[in-house]
């Protein structure tokens, strides 16, 4: 299917799905396996396979796709340039009338800080376990701010941890 078809796919498109994309290596097929975040008609984020490699795909469609793509790409580059820990951007592209895509390394076995918080939110307020999750989140925000960066849609699902590393 074409990327632009996602514009009309709604909140729960049928998966898995194959989407035709092209990068510097030429045309290829992205196999979208599951969705992690959906803004219907605008943004679809999920686990996928690209050229035999597991990736996290951010697919941007609709009338604001180009603007959202440019903002996402700029943000990813700024994080990397400032030496902040972020998944490696493997491929990206923007095609007029279709939309944009960013394909990142898939951080296997990562846990979002949202999931970590859910595991401890029922504890008494300010339990050590809650304080540890909040400290990780606030530490990440502080590191970004120290580099002159901020994230407009900051939430705990955007912070992933794996093997002692926190990814932005």
Feature-to-residue mapping (PLM):
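Conserved short alpha-helix within the protein kinase catalytic core
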Residues: 127-138
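Catalytic activation segment of kinase domains across protein kinase-like and atypical kinase folds
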Residues: 153, 157-168
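Catalytic cores of nucleotide-enabled group-transfer and carboxylate-activating enzymes in metabolic
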Residues: 98, 129, 161-162
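AlphaC helix of the protein kinase catalytic domain
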Residues: 112-125
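Juxta-kinase regulatory segment immediately upstream of eukaryotic protein kinase catalytic domains
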Residues: 1-34
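Conserved ATP-binding subdomain of kinase catalytic cores across diverse folds
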Residues: 21-114, 136-147, 151
């Amino acid at each position: 299917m074409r990327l632009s078809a996602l514009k009309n796919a709604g909140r729960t498109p049928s998966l898995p799905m194959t989407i035709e994309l092209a990068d510097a290596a030429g045309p290829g097929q992205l196999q979208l396996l599951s969705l992690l975040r959906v803004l219907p008609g605008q943004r679809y984020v999920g686990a996928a396979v690209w050229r035999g490699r597991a990736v996290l795909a951010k697919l941007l469609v609709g009338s604001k796709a180009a603007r959202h793509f440019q903002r996402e790409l700029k943000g990813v580059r700024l994080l990397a340039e400032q030496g902040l820990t972020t998944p490696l951007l493997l491929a990206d592209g923007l095609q007029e009338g279709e939309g944009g895509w960013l394909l990142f390394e898939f951080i296997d076995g990562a846990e979002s800080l949202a999931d970590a918080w859910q595991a401890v939110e029922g504890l008494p307020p300010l339990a050590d376990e809650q304080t540890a999750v909040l400290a990780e989140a606030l530490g990440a925000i502080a590191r970004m701010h120290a580099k002159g960066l901020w994230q407009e849609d900051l939430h705990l699902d955007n912070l992933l941890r794996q093997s002692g590393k926190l990814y932005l």
